[in-house]
Amino acid sequence: MSRKPGEMKVVGRPRRRVDARAKVTGQTRFADDLVLPRMLHCKLLRSPHPHARIRRIDARAALAMPGVKLVLTGADMPIPYGILPVSQDEHALCLSRVRFVGDPVAAVVALDEITASEALDRIQVDFELLRTIADPLEALSTPEPKIQPYGEGNVHKKVALEFGDVDAAMAGADQVFEDVFFYQGNTHLAIEQHAAVGAVDPDGKLTLWSSTQTPHYVHRALARVLEIPAAHIRVIATPNGGGFGGKSDPFNHEIVVAKAALLLGRPVKICLNREEVFYCHRGRHPVTMKLKTGVKNDGSIVAMDLQTLLDGGAYGSYGVASTFYTGALQTVTYQVPRYRFRGCRTFTNKPPCGPKRGHGTPQPRFAQEIQMDKIAVALRLDPARLRQSQLAKPHSLTANYMRIGTIGLSECIDRVVEGSGWKQRYGKLPFGRGIGIACSSYLCGAGLPIYWNTLPHSGVQLQLDRSGRVTAFCGATEIGQGSDDVLANLVAEVLGIDPFDIRLVTGDTDLGPVDLGSYSSRVTLMMGHAAIQAAERARELIAQAVSAKLGIPLSRMVFSDRRVFDAEDPARGFSFAEAVQVGEALHGTLGTTGSYRPPESAAKYKGGGVGPSPAYSYSACVIQVAVQPETGWVDVEKVWIAHDIGRALNPVLARGQVEGSIYMALGEALMEEMDYRRLPRHLSSALVHKFPSMLEYKSPTTLDMPEVITYLIEDPDEAGPYGAKEVGQGPLLPVMPALANALYDAVGIRVDEVPITPEKVLRALGDRTAHRCGPKNFPLIAWPDPLRVPPPWEGGDGKAENEGPRRRREGAIVAPDVVQPGLSPHPSTPEGRREPSGVASPASEMPEVLR
């Protein structure tokens, strides 16, 4: 009953997305559009200091204001939370210490937003100022005061891994290249600001509507912090006006409105303003990198040694994973037989960094692709041909045990080289104009969940009605990337109906099976497999019934054009609605489920959980620039990009994702940065955000976009649904280094950091010796001894030779950060509840609160 790719009616065809009409007519309801009866409004009082103890909070004047219903402080929600089990260091409101300008101290709930905002000014907070840690260098040299009570001083995480004898391989190299790079932090700049609404049902159950990418993880955080059974909480992810990773964490404002709704018995809404979104941040980590690569004279890599230093901000967030990601994927693009990676993440008194499109990988990709260009120049090799000659092998294991499937990168390079006229232009354009190339790879979903378990990563449930309507339920979140469209198209393809015949219920923890969320480019692959499985099971039930009714062999049943019929005699059959009725008569009410869990990783060492993926996508990019030597201005004239998508399920959506990546990448490459400055001494010398608004934080507009030529390269991977791979994040990665390499071709300078501003171009042009702008040195870091993992070609089994015994994990588990009082009482704690693990403040440090 299955179709061959050439016989597909939905998959692979350009189609209008199923939610397009609602969006273009303004009918889509985002979180801030929700208005409920008797709804109250919430605002957060944020710290004006980057690092201070909270000594006293006096909320009496605020509570005395007409219309103010509630003031909350950290003492009302003392249980810590965090997206990673190893970094439970955040609180809904600060308990006893603020750690960056913008950290929330108190919340006001009032009849309207204006009253709530005015009440914030009536709250008096006494602070004891503490030393501010401004950057990673200061964090490394200043262990006290500690920003967080865990970690090594102000170092959050250090990792060290080695795959093969890197030093010996370097000694045998014909040439060794060593460079230092810097990638500035930047933020997501989603059009929609964060918003949430909390409400309590008549039966006492909590519902939270939120502009989140991860309703499942928000659901877990609410159960933990509010200490109510998870089954009594419903999280609904509203359509997102963009996320890009910035809405992947559970956030304090979500917990605050949920708590307020529980206490007041009325709906409570919060919508952050743009400045507050900058404080939420969780964007790109600033990363300093030192990359050392040994090569033979033909350009083949013999070893690579990468060190990274991350500025993590004040909290853990995804930081442990981010640290590993700065080194995990360096081996899946080119052949790297021996590899050493060391990474360090520090705490600083800034808004916390986290995942942004490409999570942790654009920074080292920038370094690797520029150094590949430097290698090509030194060896007098064509940069495009050098890359093509060193590509990783398909269906292979890398040195760090990433399992590669199909690789369409060679064809990607061919297409951009041909389309751009590379051979006629590279090194041949007049001074001031140049062309550059870079490649990249990215994962199609993380191989492990954020909390370890053996449960499916995505589930889909189908309900078939005798009217012919199909309803698909899934926990996946539509954040603008088109996941709802993918779900409808895949189910429609299997059942032979139109995608618009399918009703979608997504992002609702009460109604849909669990999906872990929209991050790591995981949704198409993981939800897609679950959707196909559920649809195939439904098709099987219907086919059995129709086959028996008409006396037709199952092998001849065809589902197409809203009909179920005999392949040899198409007139014999039923409409799809009639076929569902036949199926219901035989089997009873029709409903099926599907689920997906990635295959087991080959990496068995500690830290090997970050990087493995069911499949990897690949991209190649060529950029042409014009540079004004007098001003340093860089104008991007044209972009050619080819992306190995496996199979394009909807080419229109795929092209939109590619071109959206180009837009975001050009902003990172040329202008966007999360920069900070010190206030004057008479204004407390606080470390504050330099550009906390869209007026000053420069980002490209439509007028800044160059012409983009997009090539979708289809090299189907059996790990993906119908061979599909990701397209939402990977195309961003090669853009920044391709632009930097084009700059070198244009005016002969290297700018080894982003953003590449006119000032940096002028600085490099004025450097008569190095013709370069970028960091000169990488700081000395006391690295731990690396875990040594023999690569596969040296007989390795994915385990570290020098790693001690690890805790054995058996079966599916419920992670310990879900607190369910009354369901699992602990006799040694008051009220029979267990004490939560995490970072809490001693009672002696708790501030006095006056209400």
Q: What is the role of each PLM region?
A:
Residues 1-156, 176-179, 447:
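Flexible, low-hydrophobicity surface segments
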Residues 13, 19-22, 153-196, 286-370, ...:
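Glycine-rich loop/linker segments at domain edges
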Residues 18-22, 121-130, 134, 213-215, ...:
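Extended active-site and interfacial segments that coordinate phosphate-rich ligands
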Residues 65, 74-75, 227-232, 262-268, ...:
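C-terminal catalytic domains of large/alpha subunits in multi-subunit enzymes
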Residues 145-226, 391-469, 683-711:
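Helix-loop-helix junctions that connect adjacent transmembrane helices in secondary transporters/permeases
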Residues 234, 239, 243-265, 269-272, ...:
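Thiamine diphosphate
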Residues 446, 451-512:
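Catalytic phosphate/nucleotide-handling subdomain of diverse soluble enzymes
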Residues 792-849:
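Intrinsic disorder/low-complexity segments
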